[in-house]
Amino acid sequence: MMDSRLLDAAASGDATMMKHLALHDPAVLLGTTPQGNTCLHISAVHGHDGFCMDVMALNRSLLSAVNNDRETPLVAAVTSGRTSTTLASSFLRCYRDLHLSEAILMQDKQGNNALHHAIRSGHRELALELIAAEPALSKAVNKYDESPMFIAVMRNYKDVFEKLLEIPDSTHGGMKGYNALHAAVRNGNSGETCQVLYLFASCFFRETKICVRGDVLLFFWF
């Protein structure tokens, strides 16, 4: 269990108290809440950049810790509504510097990884950072069979899905058997978006029959 003083320090961003506790007992930093959260998870959720950097310097293993929902501190930072993407970007750099690719690629209980969450949360720049740092994030699908590309197209994030299209083995599937091309049409995305996806259809979307008549794309789903 987590020391209550450490819990309070993580929630409030009191790095001085955290360091005091760790000085007397370094193992105190490994304590968790009943939900499996470490002090790094908690400080990430609350957006305490300084606390996070200080505690990571004392115990780097916290970066790879997952809670009961299999969320890493990186995912906690991405999904928290209280924080900017600055902290998540800082986490990402730390993961890369320490060669923690496995932790970056971690999928939570719902099958979502940090890229799924970044796109769904509207963090487009962070999504592009994640893709550049770890292209393999593009291969994962969640429990609803949604790929990062599918979610990006549903959100009409052209810059994100175009970057994903540059990755040869990036997955494109979505829920109920749909794919990113289906999503573009169903979502009423711009003709430009559909045209871009069409260029890759022969490689990625073989289950979708496509015909071109003039400037109109016709899609036959089965």
Task: Write out the residue ranges for each language-model feature.
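Ankyrin-repeat boundary/linker signal
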Residues: 32, 66, 107, 140-141, ...
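N-terminal segments that cap or nucleate solenoid repeat domains
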Residues: 1-51
